[in-house]
Regions:
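Non-transmembrane, aqueous-exposed alpha-helical and coiled segments at domain scale
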Residues: 1-312
Length: 312
């Protein structure tokens, strides 16, 4: 069977290019030992660039455009212009020197741009590219169930996550719900929160229940997933404090119809299910309530959100 025959892609979807991935890698390397963490595929960087340089943004509908090659060169030149000043002021780790040289060579290599153009054209021919109204006019008119999944975890939200270890986008369920509202959908909606039966974090950032002795058992093969950009895969006990915080920033328990807890098969193999319900020690009253729960920031107004977006 042809898997691409089952795949439809909105023609207005933003395209993250490998050039944005190079920018993401270089920015992460420029932080030295102060890792922020990045998937490194350029998704967040392409979103930021689409806001700052909308005339250069590539959409899925552009993959077969006659001027695709020229537009990729324009994207490359733009990235080179904003990356270079950052690199001049950066204090790279000595052990990152080879990686920095490699990424810069890619950015200078016209052959790399030509390769991207070829592969993008191939992808454009394989993918079933559909109009933006396909969700409303086709998918939501079918019998059955449509599953809408957010692309990021709640705690990577750029307002309620833990700066600077956040995504460039908003990741709350209401962003996914907006897709349905924009499509004019008025039928039944079931909201499910989803979490693993244990905590896992890929890369830098706070991880109160992280346990280096349990990562290999809870997440087999995770040690082979390490890279310089995302960092180490860490695992630990399911964190009730962070789970309740994530639920609360989404609107509280009443915002959900249920909570799906996954990966119990791994817990069974590990032989022990560890849960954290409260943090010990003295907690910062500015961040925690007297009951030991994380305080939820107020949602930004439209004007405040515009400022946050402009600062990305």
């Amino acid at each position: 069977a042809d898997p691409f025959a089952l795949l439809t892609v909105d023609e207005t979807a933003l395209v993250a290019t490998p050039l944005h991935g190079v920018a993401s890698h270089l920015f992460e390397l420029s932080l030295g030992s102060n890792s922020r963490g990045t998937v490194g595929t350029g998704v967040g960087q392409s979103y930021r660039d689409a806001l700052k340089y909308p005339e250069l943004a590539l959409r899925v509908g552009d993959l077969l455009a006659p001027d695709l090659r020229d537009r990729l060169y324009a994207v490359r030149d733009c990235i080179a212009n904003y990356v270079w000043p950052v690199l001049l002021d950066a204090e790279f780790l000595r052990e990152d020197s080879a990686d920095v040289r490699y990424e810069l060579e890619l950015l200078r290599d016209d052959g790399f741009v030509e390769y991207i153009a070829r592969r993008f054209r191939e992808a454009g021919k394989l993918a079933h590219i559909v109009p933006h109204d396909y969700l409303a006019e086709t998918i939501l008119r079918k019998e059955g169930v449509a599953v809408i999944e957010s692309s990021h975890g709640v705690l990577t939200d750029n307002v309620h996550g833990f700066t600077p270890h956040t995504s460039a986008i908003r990741t709350l369920p209401k962003q996914s719900r907006q897709l349905l509202d924009d499509a004019g959908y008025t039928g039944q909606v079931v909201n499910l929160g989803v979490t693993r039966a244990y905590a896992v974090r890929h890369g830098a950032g706070p991880f109160p229940t992280g346990d280096t002795t349990r990562g290999r058992h809870l997440h087999p093969g995770s040690e082979s997933q390490d890279n310089r950009y995302q960092g180490q895969v860490r695992a630990g006990a399911l964190d009730g404090v962070l789970l309740r915080y994530a639920i609360n920033v989404c609107g509280g328990p009443t915002a959900f119809d249920g909570l799906a807890v996954t990966w119990f098969d791994q817990i069974k193999r590990d032989g022990e299910w560890l849960l954290c319900d409260r943090y010990g020690g003295e907690l910062d009253p500015a961040a925690f309530t007297p009951q030991g729960e994380l305080r939820v920031r107020q949602e930004p107004t439209e004007a405040q959100q515009a400022l946050l977006t402009a600062a990305l």
